[in-house]
A protein has these predicted regions:
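Glycine/small-residue-rich loop that forms an oxyanion/phosphate-binding "nest" at active or ligand-binding sites
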Residues: 87-94, 100-103, 111-114
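The catalytic core of metal-dependent phosphodiesterases that act on cyclic dinucleotides
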Residues: 182-184
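Conserved, mostly hydrophobic/aromatic
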Residues: 19, 45, 49, 53, ...
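Short helix-capping segments at alpha-helix termini
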Residues: 84-86, 105-106, 170-173, 205-206
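Acidic (Asp/Glu)-rich catalytic clusters
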Residues: 46-47, 103-104, 122-132, 172
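Active-site-adjacent loop and "lid" segments of alpha/beta metabolic enzymes
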Residues: 2-4, 17, 25-38, 60-78, ...
Length: 247
């Protein structure tokens, strides 16, 4: 089992590139059945020395329409059959059937935006020994985008993540498999997400830290350019910043 430290040591870009295969992504940039568009995104990643690519086959934007397992698998298979490049691939899904299919097709990272609530997802992580991205989700949240009330968002997110880490470790996930993500934009209002990003250094402890703010509305509340935000994250100890790839 390779751990996070071993693969992060081979990367200098600090970027986890995002490729959406959905037709209704956050940003309308899906490339399902768009061979040339997909090829250009992968070439762009290669030219910019980006080693990590996050593949999403279903939208997670507010008000998103759910897709069937079959549709998500179809989109994933399109990518698997189209790709000829060598990257470290992450599967962005909260569907255990889709994730298992990705695992069987050489994906190395499981990125579950729902926070590993599903015990099947945890078992896949245990059995596969793959690296996981544990995304924060409020323990009382009933849906992905239910806005929760925080008194001290940085402190509470940190506590929730630590509690979830203990829980999944008790079920067999190894510490070296885990990276954490504060879930910016998910179940948090604009000011809470902005405060988390500004104070992201407070979340950096014993686990690799991954952050995704690319093209999200709350960054308008932060008086920094995209390049300054990226530098802020890297200087704060963030291991990977999720960024939408451009061609």
């Amino acid at each position: 089992m390779s751990n996070w430290n071993s693969i992060l040591s081979r990367d200098n870009s600090k970027i986890l590139g995002i490729i959406n295969l959905s037709n209704d992504s956050f940003t309308g940039d899906g490339v399902f059945n768009h061979d040339e568009g997909l090829k250009k995104l992968l070439q762009s990643a290669k030219q910019n020395d980006i080693n990590f690519i996050d593949i999403g086959c279903a939208s997670s934007k507010p008000g998103f329409d759910s897709v069937t397992t079959e549709e998500e698998i179809e989109r994933l298979n399109y990518f698997i059959n189209s790709n000829q490049e060598t990257f470290t691939f992450s599967i962005d899904s909260f569907n255990p059937i889709v994730v298992q299919h990705a695992v069987e097709n050489n994906f190395e990272i499981i990125n579950d935006v729902s926070g590993f609530l599903n015990e099947e997802m945890i078992q896949i992580a245990v059995d596969s020994k793959l690296k996981i991205i544990l995304v924060h989700r409020h323990p009382k949240s009933e849906s992905l985008h239910q806005k929760m009330i925080y008194k001290d968002v940085v402190k509470e997110v940190k506590e929730h993540l630590n509690s979830k880490i203990k829980s999944i470790i008790s079920l067999g996930v190894k510490e070296e498999q885990i990276a954490i993500d504060p879930g910016l934009g998910f179940g948090k209002n604009l000011s809470d997400s902005a405060e988390l990003l500004i104070n992201i250094k407070e979340l950096k402890e014993n686990f690799p830290l991954i952050v995704g703010y690319s093209k999200k509305e709350f960054i308008k509340n932060i008086p920094m350019s995209n390049s300054d935000l990226f530098k802020h994250c890297v200087d704060s100890g963030v291991s990977l910043v999720r960024m939408h790839l451009t061609n």
